UniProtKB/Swiss-Prot annotation:
GO terms for cellular component: cytosol. InterPro entries: DUF520, UPF0234-like_C, UPF0234_N, YajQ-like_sf. One of its GO terms (molecular function) is nucleotide binding. Coiled coil: none annotated. Keywords: Nucleotide-binding. This is Nucleotide-binding protein Bd0338. It comes from the Bacteria.
């Protein structure tokens, strides 16, 4: 029976490349000269450290630009609120959103079922598996979900006939 998976994944190597590019730009920019500004990355989340709000905002802008240029959807990152880090420093955590959580999965399933397409969506861990007897129905389902406005980037893979 034909099927495909709806997933939300991020290429961690591309994120790593974007973080390294952002670090280089932060080190080279004139408005960061002589100030303490640091971008930390531990494969799960990033931490922006700087002396004031302006520098945190500039670092966030640089990071978003570099991620976008490397093909990472900006919906895949979540900026936490800025907090005090001690020693007159400010900290902002940036987390990567991977996988489809239950609430968003329910919204996607509701969208698919309301469309009256002859497909069967089901939740499997942090992804959705959609099956049907017709490949055409699956392709209509893909275009329907692409048109939906969801708060995270969605990819469609493992299309099997």
């Amino acid at each position: 029976m034909p099927s495909f998976d709806i997933v939300s994944e991020i290429d961690v190597q591309e994120v790593d490349n974007a973080v390294n590019q952002a670090r280089k730009e932060i080190e080279a920019r004139y408005d960061f000269k002589g100030s303490k500004a640091e971008l930390q990355w531990d494969k799960k989340e990033m931490v922006l450290l700087a002396e004031d709000d302006y520098k945190i905002g500039a670092m966030a802008g640089i990071l978003q630009t570099k991620l976008h240029r490397r093909g990472i959807d900006i919906k895949a990152i979540k900026f936490e609120k800025i907090e005090e880090a001690g020693g007159r420093m400010l900290r902002q955590k940036v987390t990567l959103v991977q996988g489809i959580d239950r609430e968003i999965a329910k919204d996607i399933i509701k969208l698919i079922k309301d469309s009256k397409l002859k497909v069967q969506p089901q939740v499997a861990d942090d992804k959705l598996k959609v099956t049907s007897k017709s490949i055409d129905e699956l392709q209509e389902c893909i275009s329907l979900v692409r048109g939906g406005n969801f708060p995270l980037p969605l990819q469609f893979n493992n299309m099997r006939a």
